[in-house]
Protein backbone atom coordinates (compact mmCIF):
# COMPACT_ATOMS: atom_id res chain seq x y z
CA UNK A 1 0.00 0.00 0.00
CA UNK A 2 1.33 3.43 -0.98
CA UNK A 3 0.29 6.61 0.79
CA UNK A 4 0.16 9.59 -1.56
CA UNK A 5 -0.39 13.29 -1.07
CA UNK A 6 -3.09 15.36 -2.75
CA UNK A 7 -0.98 15.73 -5.89
CA UNK A 8 -0.45 12.01 -6.32
CA UNK A 9 3.18 11.89 -5.20
CA UNK A 10 4.12 8.95 -2.98
CA UNK A 11 5.06 10.04 0.53
CA UNK A 12 5.12 6.66 2.28
CA UNK A 13 5.29 3.00 1.31
CA UNK A 14 3.20 1.55 4.11
CA UNK A 15 4.05 -2.10 3.43
CA UNK A 16 7.79 -1.38 3.44
CA UNK A 17 7.66 0.54 6.69
CA UNK A 18 5.46 -2.04 8.44
CA UNK A 19 7.98 -4.69 7.45
CA UNK A 20 10.65 -2.80 9.37
CA UNK A 21 8.66 -2.56 12.60
CA UNK A 22 8.93 -4.94 15.52
CA UNK A 23 5.79 -6.44 17.05
CA UNK A 24 6.20 -4.13 20.04
CA UNK A 25 6.40 -1.07 17.78
CA UNK A 26 3.28 -2.11 15.90
CA UNK A 27 1.41 -2.52 19.17
CA UNK A 28 2.54 0.90 20.40
CA UNK A 29 1.15 2.48 17.22
CA UNK A 30 -2.32 1.63 18.53
CA UNK A 31 -1.91 4.04 21.42
CA UNK A 32 -0.37 7.43 21.98
CA UNK A 33 2.46 9.06 23.88
CA UNK A 34 0.63 11.14 26.46
CA UNK A 35 -2.63 12.64 25.22
CA UNK A 36 -1.43 14.35 22.07
CA UNK A 37 1.35 12.46 20.26
CA UNK A 38 1.66 9.22 18.34
CA UNK A 39 4.66 6.94 18.91
CA UNK A 40 7.53 7.48 16.45
CA UNK A 41 8.63 3.81 16.40
CA UNK A 42 12.20 4.69 17.37
CA UNK A 43 12.44 7.26 14.60
CA UNK A 44 11.04 5.04 11.84
CA UNK A 45 7.76 6.98 11.54
CA UNK A 46 7.42 10.71 12.26
CA UNK A 47 5.39 11.37 15.39
CA UNK A 48 2.06 13.06 14.77
CA UNK A 49 1.25 15.88 17.16
CA UNK A 50 -2.42 16.74 17.54
CA UNK A 51 -4.29 19.56 19.23
CA UNK A 52 -7.86 20.63 19.73
CA UNK A 53 -8.78 23.25 17.20
CA UNK A 54 -12.36 23.88 16.09
CA UNK A 55 -11.90 27.60 16.72
CA UNK A 56 -8.18 27.90 17.50
CA UNK A 57 -5.28 25.67 18.43
CA UNK A 58 -4.75 24.50 22.00
CA UNK A 59 -1.16 23.34 22.34
CA UNK A 60 -0.25 22.56 25.92
CA UNK A 61 2.58 24.36 27.67
CA UNK A 62 3.63 21.05 29.21
CA UNK A 63 2.73 17.49 28.31
CA UNK A 64 0.82 15.96 31.21
CA UNK A 65 -1.80 13.27 30.78
CA UNK A 66 -5.22 14.74 31.46
CA UNK A 67 -3.95 18.34 31.65
CA UNK A 68 -5.84 20.53 29.18
CA UNK A 69 -5.70 23.82 31.08
CA UNK A 70 -2.18 25.06 30.26
CA UNK A 71 -2.37 25.89 26.57
CA UNK A 72 0.02 28.27 24.89
CA UNK A 73 -1.33 31.65 23.74
CA UNK A 74 -3.24 31.36 20.47
CA UNK A 75 -5.91 33.23 18.57
CA UNK A 76 -9.45 32.49 19.72
CA UNK A 77 -11.57 32.64 16.59
CA UNK A 78 -15.38 32.87 16.65
CA UNK A 79 -16.98 29.61 17.68
CA UNK A 80 -18.70 27.49 15.05
CA UNK A 81 -22.14 28.56 16.24
CA UNK A 82 -21.15 32.21 15.77
CA UNK A 83 -19.40 31.97 12.42
CA UNK A 84 -22.24 29.84 11.06
CA UNK A 85 -24.39 32.97 11.22
CA UNK A 86 -22.30 34.35 8.35
CA UNK A 87 -23.54 31.64 5.95
CA UNK A 88 -20.15 32.16 4.28
CA UNK A 89 -18.05 29.05 3.50
CA UNK A 90 -15.25 31.21 2.06
CA UNK A 91 -14.94 33.11 5.33
CA UNK A 92 -14.78 29.84 7.24
CA UNK A 93 -12.10 28.66 4.81
CA UNK A 94 -10.01 31.75 5.58
CA UNK A 95 -10.39 31.02 9.28
CA UNK A 96 -9.16 27.49 8.65
CA UNK A 97 -6.12 28.86 6.82
CA UNK A 98 -5.32 31.18 9.74
CA UNK A 99 -5.60 28.31 12.22
CA UNK A 100 -3.29 26.22 10.03
CA UNK A 101 -0.66 28.97 10.02
CA UNK A 102 -0.58 28.99 13.81
CA UNK A 103 -0.48 25.19 13.86
CA UNK A 104 2.56 25.16 11.56
CA UNK A 105 4.35 27.64 13.79
CA UNK A 106 3.82 25.34 16.78
CA UNK A 107 4.82 22.24 14.77
CA UNK A 108 1.36 20.73 15.09
CA UNK A 109 0.52 18.00 12.59
CA UNK A 110 -3.24 17.73 13.00
CA UNK A 111 -6.07 19.90 14.25
CA UNK A 112 -8.91 17.96 15.89
CA UNK A 113 -11.78 19.64 14.10
CA UNK A 114 -14.10 20.66 12.87
CA UNK A 115 -17.04 19.36 14.87
CA UNK A 116 -20.25 18.95 12.92
CA UNK A 117 -22.63 17.32 15.36
CA UNK A 118 -26.20 18.29 14.57
CA UNK A 119 -27.85 20.43 17.24
CA UNK A 120 -30.96 18.61 18.44
CA UNK A 121 -31.10 19.78 22.07
CA UNK A 122 -30.30 23.21 23.56
CA UNK A 123 -28.98 21.33 26.61
CA UNK A 124 -25.94 19.95 24.77
CA UNK A 125 -22.91 21.42 26.52
CA UNK A 126 -20.84 21.65 23.34
CA UNK A 127 -23.38 23.22 21.00
CA UNK A 128 -21.11 26.25 20.65
CA UNK A 129 -18.56 24.01 18.89
CA UNK A 130 -21.00 22.93 16.19
CA UNK A 131 -22.30 24.91 13.24
CA UNK A 132 -26.00 24.34 13.05
CA UNK A 133 -29.12 22.21 13.30
CA UNK A 134 -29.20 22.39 9.49
CA UNK A 135 -27.29 19.54 7.76
CA UNK A 136 -26.98 21.50 4.51
CA UNK A 137 -25.39 24.58 6.08
CA UNK A 138 -23.19 22.43 8.28
CA UNK A 139 -21.82 20.51 5.29
CA UNK A 140 -20.99 23.67 3.36
CA UNK A 141 -19.19 25.35 6.26
CA UNK A 142 -17.34 22.21 7.32
CA UNK A 143 -16.06 21.76 3.78
CA UNK A 144 -14.70 25.30 3.83
CA UNK A 145 -13.01 24.77 7.19
CA UNK A 146 -11.36 21.48 6.21
CA UNK A 147 -10.18 22.84 2.86
CA UNK A 148 -8.71 25.90 4.56
CA UNK A 149 -6.74 24.01 7.18
CA UNK A 150 -5.50 21.32 4.82
CA UNK A 151 -4.45 23.82 2.14
CA UNK A 152 -1.37 24.54 4.27
CA UNK A 153 -0.52 20.90 4.87
CA UNK A 154 -2.07 20.57 8.32
CA UNK A 155 -4.28 17.54 8.93
CA UNK A 156 -7.85 17.64 10.22
CA UNK A 157 -10.17 15.31 12.10
CA UNK A 158 -13.85 15.60 11.21
CA UNK A 159 -15.92 14.78 14.30
CA UNK A 160 -17.89 13.23 16.00
CA UNK A 161 -19.13 10.47 13.71
CA UNK A 162 -22.00 10.04 14.40
CA UNK A 163 -25.35 10.78 16.08
CA UNK A 164 -23.69 12.54 19.02
CA UNK A 165 -25.89 15.45 20.09
CA UNK A 166 -25.56 15.38 23.87
CA UNK A 167 -22.72 15.53 26.38
CA UNK A 168 -24.54 13.92 29.30
CA UNK A 169 -23.36 10.30 29.51
CA UNK A 170 -21.89 10.61 26.03
CA UNK A 171 -19.50 7.72 26.71
CA UNK A 172 -22.32 5.27 27.34
CA UNK A 173 -25.51 6.71 25.86
CA UNK A 174 -27.39 4.78 23.20
CA UNK A 175 -28.74 6.81 20.27
CA UNK A 176 -31.69 4.88 18.88
CA UNK A 177 -32.42 5.98 15.36
CA UNK A 178 -34.17 4.80 12.22
CA UNK A 179 -32.52 4.76 8.80
CA UNK A 180 -34.44 7.71 7.36
CA UNK A 181 -33.57 10.01 10.26
CA UNK A 182 -29.95 8.89 10.10
CA UNK A 183 -29.74 9.61 6.37
CA UNK A 184 -31.71 12.86 6.30
CA UNK A 185 -30.40 14.60 9.42
CA UNK A 186 -27.23 13.10 10.87
CA UNK A 187 -25.16 11.87 7.92
CA UNK A 188 -25.56 14.45 5.09
CA UNK A 189 -23.01 16.92 6.51
CA UNK A 190 -20.46 14.16 7.03
CA UNK A 191 -21.06 12.79 3.56
CA UNK A 192 -20.61 16.14 1.82
CA UNK A 193 -17.49 17.05 3.79
CA UNK A 194 -15.89 13.63 3.33
CA UNK A 195 -16.50 13.59 -0.41
CA UNK A 196 -15.61 17.22 -1.18
CA UNK A 197 -12.95 18.18 1.38
CA UNK A 198 -11.41 14.73 2.01
CA UNK A 199 -10.44 15.29 5.67
CA UNK A 200 -7.25 13.63 6.87
CA UNK A 201 -9.17 11.67 9.47
CA UNK A 202 -12.64 11.09 10.85
CA UNK A 203 -13.13 10.82 14.61
CA UNK A 204 -15.72 8.32 15.80
CA UNK A 205 -18.07 9.43 18.55
CA UNK A 206 -18.16 7.74 21.96
CA UNK A 207 -21.86 6.92 22.08
CA UNK A 208 -23.62 3.80 20.91
CA UNK A 209 -25.87 3.84 17.85
CA UNK A 210 -28.71 1.35 18.05
CA UNK A 211 -26.78 -0.58 20.66
CA UNK A 212 -23.34 -0.62 19.01
CA UNK A 213 -20.52 1.74 19.98
CA UNK A 214 -19.62 4.08 17.12
CA UNK A 215 -15.93 3.18 17.29
CA UNK A 216 -16.71 -0.42 16.38
CA UNK A 217 -19.84 0.11 14.33
CA UNK A 218 -19.25 -1.72 11.05
CA UNK A 219 -22.31 -0.21 9.40
CA UNK A 220 -21.11 3.35 9.98
CA UNK A 221 -17.34 2.95 9.69
CA UNK A 222 -17.07 0.33 6.95
CA UNK A 223 -20.31 -0.03 5.01
CA UNK A 224 -21.08 3.69 4.77
CA UNK A 225 -17.81 5.57 5.33
CA UNK A 226 -15.42 3.25 3.49
CA UNK A 227 -17.53 1.44 0.92
CA UNK A 228 -20.34 3.86 0.15
CA UNK A 229 -18.48 7.16 0.46
CA UNK A 230 -15.10 5.72 -0.67
CA UNK A 231 -13.25 7.36 2.23
CA UNK A 232 -9.56 6.43 2.41
CA UNK A 233 -8.33 8.53 5.34
CA UNK A 234 -7.74 7.54 8.93
CA UNK A 235 -10.44 6.77 11.47
In which residue ranges do the predicted regions lie?
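Glycoside hydrolase catalytic-domain context in secreted enzymes
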Residues: 2-235
